[in-house]
């Protein structure tokens, strides 16, 4: 199926992204033209710089740009869940303002692997990342495959991004509060629902401006808490004691 026959919602949580936001939205909107219908939902997560002002200006230029605002910083995971509840189109993707996924790749990726219920994007490499970031990413992969060996046997990278059917997202809606586990939880829930899950390797664009919070000890602890909680939940699902 061609992108011109597909409707897509793109979610983008942002926090103090005044340096990135205009370029990110301009590039994303160019790619949106390739789709039958597309919307970009930006969640301003309590920014205290000029991010909100720039978003307001951009929303005048782009009618399919929806700006949501958190009055305080609540984190990526909660912002994503907020955005997921607002999507209108058939497929859903999330990206960051620093564009780790180049918007120009979106249509090509979808057409390569269509049809699917969930398409997991896996990073080709970790070039130019710090040793700490590489260690955390590799350690995270190992831990996930220890806790969920069968469900993740064919998935190497659960912490980049994905493209998912809206109907499946509603059934696999996450409870995670950690940005490091929310995507993994959705993937696992989709697997337990026997969804058609595919993977594709894509180029990862390293962040150039501002800072990312992935790899901070507090976020790692939240991630472990989410992981253990969902592992217990998944055992009950497998045993038939609890539903999704």
How would you label these PLM feature ranges?
Residues 6-8, 29-41, 50, 63-66:
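Short loop->beta transition adjacent to catalytic acidic/histidine clusters or analogous donor-positioning motifs
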Residues 44-53, 99:
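A conserved acidic beta->alpha catalytic loop
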Residues 1-6, 147-152, 175-244:
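Hydrophobic helical membrane-anchoring modules
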Residues 17-20, 47, 76, 102:
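Donor nucleotide-sugar binding loop of glycosyltransferases
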Residues 17-31:
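Short, well-formed alpha-helical segments that are part of the catalytic scaffolds
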Residues 19-23, 49-58:
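Acidic helix N-cap motif at the loop->helix transition within catalytic regions
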Residues 38, 52-86:
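Conserved donor nucleotide-binding strand/loop of the catalytic core
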Residues 70-86, 91-94, 103-180, 207-215, ...:
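Acceptor/aglycone-binding surface of glycosyltransferases and processive sugar-polymer synthases
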